[in-house]
Amino acid sequence: MKKIIFATGNQDKMREIREILADIDAEVVSMKEAGIHADIVEDGSTFEENAVIKAKTICELTGEITLADDSGLEIDYLNKEPGIYSARYMGEDTSYHIKNASLIERLNGVPDEKRTARFVCAVAAAFPDGSVKTVRGTMEGRIGYEEKGENGFGYDPIFYLPEYGCTLSLIHISEPTRHAQIS
């Protein structure tokens, strides 16, 4: 059976990717499961560049097909912040409750039509022959005025989806379905 390495140490992401790739004929393993302990510097200027950096680094170390992702939140009014720094916005140890409160405060007084935002996810696949493929998906919405909902994670409680009339945290959908909606 073929092996695909998913370049993450995040067990929630591993669970999600295994659900998404359940129908392929390959064993999907994490870096830890593959015995890889690499501290990869994500110094790209786009989500795609960061995903490629991770995928190529691990593929070159192992000779195995490697998938990697980079994702985050872009808020148009804030010049697409926090963008590629979404996880590190206000510091990696800062809770998302505090990060969300900060973003809401920064948008204080900004009308609905200027609170447009999107979740972005870029995935890179690096192959042993040196080739790399990337794909980018987005989910459009707005930033709400307060946190709402307990489901999801990160910025989900402030990411308002007008077509559903609620935040992403209030929508009860499975993770693979959630990712499939990013197109």
Question: Language model features by range: what are they?
Answer:
Residues 171-183:
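Single conserved hydrophobic/aromatic residue that forms the stacking wall/gate
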Residues 2-5, 11-170:
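Anionic-ligand binding patches
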